[in-house]
């Protein structure tokens, strides 16, 4: 048995197993380190050639067994690691492992396991979320640093591309985004990001590497404050840059619907417009929830409303005439009061995207949400990230 932990500017890889397996993981990681350094040289004009001092690099990034076993505590009940997971094409994605947590541990709710860890009626001890907004390689999405995030794709096409990576792979779900947002709120580390054309609107010194002929930034190129826990190894770019698909929540004819728990992670869950995988989002007493829009005001109610329109405002101005732990677990509440909430409660179906984009300014944030785009939309500001669970 062998163990290894590699680190490079906040990018980490841990492996444990047979020596041959660990050696392959280390070689792959070092290859990506060199690619990253070369890309930095192209974009920034400075970087060391890793071939000049490979032994020094190896000594710097290889840690001992004790460090490998160490786990950073991010919130009560939540631990994470950064690992490389390979798909059926043999290409790795850099993924963040989150361990099972209850609503009580995360935000003071019930002792129920957070829905992100309940898939197909089974409770999972851990799930994996892409560290980076995904880029496309041969039609499959990957979590890799310093890449251009994929955009101009519909949610369903992106979801199918995620499923094509193999068992357990899926488009990030609304439940998983809720876990990220609630964790950030618990930690007091609401992420900054590219909200002002490669800069953070709150501090122009916080900047990512801008993509040519675009205001988007390369994945993971911002500072540590652009992650969910304000560490270099956190989940990057949840605030701004591009709106991200959060599969498994929608509004239809003014009513709120969701996949059960984290069943949106399963390809067999029918989340087509008329699919049977949709369940009403409810309050504490089981009443279905609706959204009324009138006079530029958004109100969450337990009854349907004749006031159905489109509106955007900040979460701090949204009226919540209901008590719903489900909404709290999905981070559909004013956890970030200045983050935007956009709702179209008119006739039709509108999917959930989250986070905001490069020009959203103060309305961007991990709690920013938009239920105002049909599932057929493919925009230059819409993209996503994959997630993974090891099926029982």
Where are these regions (language model features)?
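A short local loop/turn or secondary-structure capping micro-motif enriched for an aromatic residue
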Residues: 22-24, 252-255
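Extracellular adhesion/carbohydrate-recognition regions
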Residues: 79-168, 253-298, 385
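Charged, compositionally biased non-catalytic regions
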Residues: 45, 53-80
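C-terminal, surface-exposed recognition/capping segments
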Residues: 55, 59, 63, 178, ...
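Carbohydrate-recognition beta-sandwich/jelly-roll modules
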Residues: 72-81, 85-121, 281, 309-311, ...
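Short secondary-structure boundary/capping segments
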Residues: 185-190, 250, 260-261
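Short aromatic-cysteine micro-motif
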Residues: 112-238, 242, 269
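Compositionally biased, non-globular sequence tracts
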Residues: 1-57
């Amino acid at each position: 048995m062998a163990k290894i932990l590699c680190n490079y500017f906040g990018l980490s890889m841990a492996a444990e197993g047979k020596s041959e397996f660990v050696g392959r993981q280390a070689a792959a990681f070092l290859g990506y380190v060199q690619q990253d350094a070369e890309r930095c040289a192209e974009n920034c004009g400075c970087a060391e050639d890793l071939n000049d001092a490979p032994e020094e690099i190896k000594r710097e990034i290889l840690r001992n067994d004790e460090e490998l076993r160490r786990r950073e505590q991010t919130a009560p009940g939540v631990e994470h690691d950064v690992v490389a997971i390979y798909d059926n094409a043999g290409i790795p994605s850099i993924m963040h492992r989150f361990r099972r947590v209850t609503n009580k541990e995360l935000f003071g709710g019930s002792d129920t396991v957070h829905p992100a860890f309940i898939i197909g009626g089974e409770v999972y001890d851990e799930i994996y979320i892409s560290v980076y907004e995904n880029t496309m390689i041969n039609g499959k999405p990957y979590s890799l640093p310093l890449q251009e995030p994929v955009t101009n794709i519909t949610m369903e096409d992106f979801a199918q591309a995620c499923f094509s990576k193999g068992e357990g792979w899926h488009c990030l779900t609304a439940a998983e985004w809720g876990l990220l947002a609630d964790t950030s709120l618990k930690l007091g580390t609401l992420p900054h990001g590219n909200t002002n054309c490669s800069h953070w609107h709150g501090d122009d010194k916080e900047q990512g590497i801008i993509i040519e002929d675009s205001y988007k930034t390369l994945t993971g190129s911002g500072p540590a404050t652009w992650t969910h826990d304000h560490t270099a190894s956190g989940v990057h770019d949840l605030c701004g840059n591009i709106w991200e698909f959060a599969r498994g929540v929608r509004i239809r004819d003014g009513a709120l619907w969701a996949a059960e728990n984290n069943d949106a992670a399963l390809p067999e869950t029918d989340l087509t417009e008329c699919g049977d995988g949709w369940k009403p989002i409810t309050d504490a007493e089981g009443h279905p929830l609706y959204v009324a829009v009138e006079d530029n005001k958004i109100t969450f109610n337990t009854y349907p409303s004749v006031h159905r329109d489109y509106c955007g405002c900040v979460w701090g101005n949204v009226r919540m005439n209901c008590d719903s732990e489900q909404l709290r677990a999905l981070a559909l509440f004013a956890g970030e009061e200045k983050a935007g909430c956009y709702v179209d409660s008119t006739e039709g179906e509108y999917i959930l995207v989250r986070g905001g984009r490069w020009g959203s300014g103060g309305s961007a944030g991990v709690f920013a949400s938009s239920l105002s785009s049909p599932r057929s939309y493919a925009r230059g500001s819409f993209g996503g990230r994959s997630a993974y669970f090891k099926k029982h």
